[in-house]
Amino acid sequence: MERTLSGVESQLVLELEWDKKRIVTIDDVARILRCRRNEARVIAHRLEKKRWLERLRRNRYLFIPAERGEMGVPTMNPLLVGSLLVEPYYYSYSTSNAHYGFSTQMRPTLYLATTKTRRSFRWRNSQFRFVTLSRHKFFGFQEVEVLGVKVNMAEPEKTVVDSVDKLKYAGGVQEVLAVICNGLRKVDAERLVEYARRMRNHSLIQRMGYLIDVLLNEGVASFPEDERERLLPHVGKAAIYLDPAGEKSGRLDKAWRVIGNVPRSELLSEVQIR
């Protein structure tokens, strides 16, 4: 079907173009055209068939502006789509690890940190997972350009900290060790420690300190001793397991109060020993 528009449809599209709308709801259509929701749904359905709108979920559409050409080719950048689904947000965990080259694992799920609660969402071949953070943890991100699109991405230091904070969203403890190994070559150590302390999470500090020591002992990474010392006062009294999902046994590291329940060979499986 051609992208030709009726008078009412033209009014809506011009308004959306003028407002630079990316996401359009049925309520938006009803408000702009001053019509009932049932009428708005019919109009939205027609515009979907004419490739001016692409359905994201019930009553929610991606607007495909005139600049996308006569065929109405929608955007193919899932990072753009994700950025339009929730506010505030920033990409983190496996997604930002891949962006900075801290991980070579390419995962189909895109992880967005937010202070809101949102259900997971699928668009084409991409799965979006929304990770709800407390407000004091929602910091340390910047605007970056990816494939011509500007999105919010965790800073390198916050990427590492977030990954240690929520291991399962970064591929598990073995993958996170590799992330730290690669990240320590690029991040600012002082900022890394400061961000870790700002999270107000003893377990995070304990795991990060333990994993940094593993890399130091293997001789595959370096870390300033004074920054390591800044972490130690924030070690909690309670001992924790390195891998929360692992075996409930292992040797206790007294400095970090971490029970190493992952065999060394398994823990280092994702780290390139040089």
Segments (PLM) and residue ranges:
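Hydrophobic/aromatic-lined pockets within catalytic cores
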Residues: 34, 48, 101, 165-169, ...
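Short gly/ser-rich loop at a beta-strand->alpha-helix junction or flexible surface loop bordering the NTP-binding
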Residues: 26, 45, 49-50, 55-68, ...
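Hydrophobic alpha-helical interaction segments
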Residues: 142-274
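Generic structural signal for bulky hydrophobic/aromatic residues embedded
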Residues: 32, 99-100, 163, 211
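A residue-level signal for conserved active-site and pocket-lining positions in enzyme catalytic cores
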Residues: 29, 96, 160
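Short beta-edge/loop segments at beta->alpha junctions of small alpha/beta modules
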Residues: 1-88, 185-205, 213
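Short N-terminal helix-initiation segments at or just after the protein's N-terminus
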Residues: 23-27, 40-42, 98-105, 236-247
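Short amphipathic alpha-helical segments with coiled-coil-like heptad repeat character
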Residues: 37-39, 104-106, 168-172
